[in-house]
């Protein structure tokens, strides 16, 4: 018996995955943090560590919330004896009396600082900061790379400090400190800010030239205790103002490099209509 003829092979019903096309532009500029000298790094870390220990700034977490036991069933709770419950209640009262209130202590010192990348970013946008310090151990580096342009546009000294999180986080009771900044209303870190700013290297962004200079050259040497609060605020405002080297009437000559297109890929999902042919008109 002859074999039945087979149907011609058909194409697969499974559709091919469309090619994802993304347009990207190459940035001709390389923006990076300026290198900090080893001597300045040790000075900044030691100064901050000593001051934070002297003030006693620390975050205290509630151990009850951290070591909270799961909800017990009714049967297991009924088996517990009354004597054990009474002894546990007495122990809890004693420990509660010894434990401190959870949160930052002292609270007024915490309000003078911005801790964390998000908090530092928001404070920079509101122009509330005097000095920004970023840890070098951040991975990936783009987590803090936006602070370079933002700090320079706000005329705030900023630098990347190696081992910042390793040295400062245990002192204030945190696991890590990726960014630390000092606000303009600070009163407990005035001397430290004045001592650190001259050691901060200047940032370089091609389209933000001459935005900030060495802020430590023109600092007043008078003791801050003899100055009023108004003079302190004005001195910090003058410290944060940009100082331009350009003379009157001259403008900064910034040469912008052209953007280079990496690759042009036609969109395969685009439906291309065939050109309409002109119909012959009857004579």
UniProtKB/Swiss-Prot annotation:
Family annotation (SUPFAM superfamilies): L30e-like
Cellular component annotations (GO), alphabetically ordered: fibrillar center; multimeric ribonuclease P complex; nucleolar ribonuclease P complex; nucleolus; nucleoplasm; ribonuclease MRP complex
Keyword Transmembrane tagged: no
InterPro entries, per the entry: Ribosomal_eL30-like_sf, Ribosomal_eL8/eL30/eS12/Gad45, Rpp38
Alphabetic keyword roster: Acetylation, Nucleus, Phosphoprotein, RNA-binding, rRNA processing, tRNA processing
Entry-annotated residues carrying Phosphoserine: 12, 226, 235
N-acetylalanine: modified positions: 2
GO biological process terms held by the UniProt record: rRNA processing; tRNA 5'-leader removal
Pfam families referenced in this protein's UniProt entry, alphabetically: Ribosomal_L7Ae (PF01248)
RNA-binding keyword on record: yes
Superkingdom of origin organism: Eukaryota
GO function term, MF aspect, one: ribonuclease P RNA binding
Localization of this protein: Nucleus, Nucleolus
Family statement drawn from the similarity comment of this UniProt entry: Belongs to the eukaryotic ribosomal protein eL8 family.
Miscellaneous notes: Autoantibodies against RPP38 are found in sera from scleroderma patients.
Purpose: Component of ribonuclease P, a ribonucleoprotein complex that generates mature tRNA molecules by cleaving their 5'-ends. Also a component of the MRP ribonuclease complex, which cleaves pre-rRNA sequences.
Subunit structure: Component of nuclear RNase P and RNase MRP ribonucleoproteins. RNase P consists of a catalytic RNA moiety and about 10 protein subunits; POP1, POP4, POP5, POP7, RPP14, RPP21, RPP25, RPP30, RPP38 and RPP40. Within the RNase P complex, POP1, POP7 and RPP25 form the 'finger' subcomplex, POP5, RPP14, RPP40 and homodimeric RPP30 form the 'palm' subcomplex, and RPP21, POP4 and RPP38 form the 'wrist' subcomplex. All subunits of the RNase P complex interact with the catalytic RNA. Several subunits of RNase P are also part of the RNase MRP complex.
Protein name: Ribonuclease P protein subunit p38
Organism: Homo sapiens
């Amino acid at each position: 018996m002859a074999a039945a003829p087979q149907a011609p092979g058909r194409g697969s019903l499974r559709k091919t995955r469309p090619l994802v096309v993304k347009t990207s532009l190459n940035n001709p500029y390389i923006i990076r943090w300026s290198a900090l000298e080893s001597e300045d790094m040790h000075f900044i870390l030691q100064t901050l560590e000593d001051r934070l220990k002297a003030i006693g700034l620390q975050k205290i977490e509630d151990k009850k919330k951290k070591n909270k036991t799961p909800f017990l069933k009714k049967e297991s709770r009924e088996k517990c004896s009354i004597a054990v419950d009474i002894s546990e209640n007495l122990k809890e009262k004693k420990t509660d009396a010894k434990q401190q209130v959870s949160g930052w202590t002292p609270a007024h010192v915490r309000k003078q600082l911005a801790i964390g990348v998000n908090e530092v970013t928001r404070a920079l946008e509101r122009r509330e900061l005097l000095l920004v310090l970023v840890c070098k151990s951040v991975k990936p580096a783009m987590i803090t790379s936006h602070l370079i342009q933002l700090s320079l546009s706000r005329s705030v000294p900023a630098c990347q400090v190696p081992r910042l999180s390793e040295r400062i986080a245990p002192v204030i009771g945190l696991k890590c400190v990726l960014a630390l900044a000092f606000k303009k209303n600070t009163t407990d870190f005035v001397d430290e800010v004045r001592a650190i700013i001259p050691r901060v290297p200047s940032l370089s962004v091609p389209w933000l030239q001459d935005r900030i200079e060495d802020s430590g050259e023109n600092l007043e040497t008078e003791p801050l205790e003899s100055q009023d609060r108004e003079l302190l605020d004005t001195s910090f405002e003058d410290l944060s103002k940009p100082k331009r080297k350009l003379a009157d009437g001259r403008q900064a000559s910034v040469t912008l490099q052209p953007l280079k297109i990496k690759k042009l890929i036609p969109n395969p999902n685009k439906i291309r209509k065939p050109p309409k042919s002109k119909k012959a008109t009857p004579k």
